[in-house]
Amino acid sequence: MRLEQPRNSLKRSTLDLIERVNRDEYPSLPQDSKCKDALVSAFRKTANFKKYNRPDVNSREQLISPSLTEEDLLGRIRQRYKEKIFAGGQEKFADQSFIAEQIASTYEDFKDNPTLPAYCGEMTYLLYYHLREEGIKPENMLVVGFSANAEDHVLLMYSSDEGFLEQIKNDYFEQEEEGEEAESYKNFIELCARRDKNQTLLLLDPWSQDNKILDLNQLDRDESTNEVIEDYFKNKREALEEGFQPHAIIDGVLEESRVSKATGSVINMETLSFQVDAFKPEELMEIDEENTSDSSEEGTSKNRFRDTLFSNVPDSSSDSENEQEREKKELAGKTPSFRLC
């Protein structure tokens, strides 16, 4: 059985985006021609990926058109992805460039398949990878995650000012160190509002059908940055409730009290960074095909870390009381949180 072709709407939305970029509808891009050309090329390369939710999310598409072929392919990609990530666990924190390269390499292994299922996190890192190939420096990009109750979403920030993204990371983690709670979109919006109006600042969302690029310099003078961004994400959440509920593959890493209880809902990372304080590098390097399979012996730190990274099921060693309290807060409508991924 052949995989079904990508959604025409996804391809069409990408082509529409490229046309808008070429028509200079995004005011920042004409003055940043390198970024403009890189975006056109990178988005074109993501057009053939098939939007897909994690297996534990009962999306509308999965309920209507299940495909064992797709599930099998997805499982193979997950396995290869896990092997590559663990094989590189030599540093305390994995940086965004490394993660992007591993994901791109995994998908290259399956390039003969016309459509590959991809989560929003994968699509974002693939876009990051292709932008790097086009000459955009890692210092100009930052992958961030948003969480609305149990729903996570990942997108990419681009700034022509390297210091601005560094400031976002430093300011946000400084807030965490002072014991303040990570604030929904509020913290993110306030940080974006501080920007130098002469810089190019874009939110890039390859998963989105209608809002793949949000140019913050596109705002009218009588509109505040806060209002526009709040409206953007508000509309996005409403749309997700009617259709997809995208989750990043890195959801497990970002969930508070699963890998790092010290930093709340934020784990210090260059983008996808996961803390491995409790896991020795040599242990990570020992993970092979046998002990990363579903039949692996449970209860080891390696398996717990693996399950944390790739499963939405809480780790059995986690503090169940804290986990229940966290879930109650989320279900009660806790304001979505912004996190550096």
From Swiss-Prot:
Region listing for Disordered, in residue ranges: 287-341
Main location: cytoplasm
Highest taxon above the source species: Bacteria
Location in the cell: Cytoplasm
Keywords: Cytoplasm, Plasmid
Keyword hit for Nucleotide-binding: no
A GO CC term assigned to this protein in UniProt: cytoplasm
Protein's UniProt keywords contain Nucleotidyltransferase: no
Biased composition (Basic and acidic residues): 323-332
Biased composition (Acidic residues): 287-297
Function: May be involved in the pathogenesis of acute Q fever.
Name the record gives this protein: Protein CbhE
Gene: cbhE
